[in-house]
Amino acid sequence: MKSIQSNIKKAKKYLDNNHCVAVPTETVYGLAANAYSNSAVKKIFSLKKRPLNNPLIVHYYDIQRLKEDCDINDNLVKLYKKFSPGPITYVLKLKNNSKISKFVTNNKKSIAVRFPKHKLLRNLLKNLDYPVAAPSANISSRLSSVKPSDVKEEFGSKIKYILNGGKSKIGVESTILNLLEKPSLLRYGGLDTKKIENVLKKKLLINTNSKKKLSSGLFPLHYSPGIPLRVNVKKPKKDEAYFCLLYTSPSPRDLSTSRMPSSA
């Protein structure tokens, strides 16, 4: 217990001094920084080599702290009571007097927020005076990190500290909902959309506006393997391996499609 508290204090010290810290979540590891600090948030973009027009998800301890920065609506309250903390992100209206860094939202009047379930991160958030912006801890468009060694492989000594919380249980990012108007799905993720619809008692609209980037994970290039990929291969060459995608969704509406690049 003492070592856990010591690690949390160490992570807090780095965050308080506007450094980036890798943190565990139930979905994937995040690269965290003080969401109220422009200089800290800019370090996230620099380390990840991430475009500045790609908004970040901000992690809060609870809905009471969220009220300082966002307008709370009925749909959020319903979903929060059922699924948060957990692998779901909400896009909400940002208050005019919010202290959230403009780099988090790309100067938009909306923000993507979530309440992580991992006990270690929740303990850290409870002890901070600010929420943290925390996109996945990987170079932009590369595969997400699900354990400390993945983070170390991606960034080496470029980040100050990795808060070791073991392997992420879910392994894929959070489901993202737009709650600015009628609830709509922006990204499939760690929470089944059917469960969300059961709580809302309505079908989710599917986001079709690819130009309006309200949250992270909405760019055409998101997951890119670091080695060449060949498709429709009958026999692998030496040092190659098969990569198989299994479709287990109960409904075709849960499929996202994209044209493969010519280099694949």
Question: For each predicted feature, which ranges?
Answer:
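Positively charged, low-complexity/disordered segments
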Residues: 252-254, 258-264
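Active-site-adjacent structural elements in enzyme catalytic cores
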Residues: 1-249, 253
